C-alpha cells in the first residue's frame, strides 16, 4: 500500500494518497503495529499540511492523542516527533514569536499558535525531555520494527543502533535544536 501512496504523491494527488494512508493507519491500529502507526501519522500530517489551511493545530493534537494511547518506546519516538513539530512551527514563524510579549500563563492551553516564545520553548523542552524517559531501556531497545521510520546506522559488528542514541541525538542536536538549547541558556 505504501507504493500506492508514493505513486499518488508523485502524481500530485495528495487526497488520494491520504485515503490510502488512512487505510494503512486503520490496519496498523488493528494489528497493533506501532511503527506503521507512527509512519502513517507522519504521512497523514504531511498531507494535512498540504490539503488543509492551518492544519498545524490538528496535527499537534493528533500526536498528543497518540502519545496518550502509546507505550514505551513508541511514546518516546512520538514525543521526539512532537517536539520537532513545535520546533518547525517556531522556525517557520520565528518573526511572530520574537514580536510577542511574554504572558504570565498560556493564553490558550491548546492552541500553541497563541503562545509566547518562552511558553513554546518550555513545551519543546518538555517533549524532548519526555522523549528521553527510560534512557537505559531506550539504549537497549531493538529498533528492527522501526526500520520503516529511521535510517539506522549499522555498527561494524552488524548490530543496530539503540533507540536511545537516535532519540538522544534528536533531542540534543537534531533538527536545529542547537539553536533552541543556546537560546534557553
Task: Go through each PLM region and give its residues.
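Extracytoplasmic/secretory-pathway proteins
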Residues: 1-185
Amino acid at each position: 500500500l505504501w507504493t500506492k501512496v508514493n505513486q499518488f504523491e508523485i502524481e500530485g494527488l495528495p487526497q488520494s494518497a491520504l485515503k490510502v494512508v488512512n487505510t494503512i493507519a486503520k490496519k496498523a491500529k488493528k494489528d497493533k503495529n506501532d511503527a506503521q502507526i507512527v509512519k502513517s501519522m507522519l504521512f497523514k500530517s504531511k498531507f494535512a499540511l498540504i490539503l488543509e489551511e492551518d492544519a498545524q493545530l490538528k496535527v499537534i493534537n493528533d500526536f498528543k492523542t497518540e502519545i496518550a494511547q502509546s507505550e514505551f518506546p513508541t511514546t518516546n519516538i512520538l514525543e521526539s516527533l512532537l517536539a520537532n513539530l513545535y520546533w518547525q512551527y517556531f522556525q517557520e514563524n520565528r518573526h511572530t514569536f520574537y514580536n510577542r510579549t511574554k504572558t504570565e500563563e498560556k493564553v490558550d492551553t491548546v492552541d500553541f499558535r497563541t503562545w509566547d516564545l518562552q511558553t513554546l520553548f518550555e513545551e519543546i523542552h518538555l517533549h524532548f525531555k519526555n522523549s528521553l524517559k527510560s534512557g537505559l531501556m531506550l539504549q537497549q531497545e531493538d529498533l528492527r520494527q522501526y526500520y520503516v521510520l529511521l535510517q539506522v546506522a549499522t555498527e561494524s559488528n552488524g548490530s543496530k543502533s539503540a533507540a536511545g542514541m537516535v532519540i538522544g541525538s534528536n533531542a540534543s542536536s537534531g533538527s536545529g535544536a542547537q539553536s533552541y538549547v543556546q537560546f534557553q541558556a
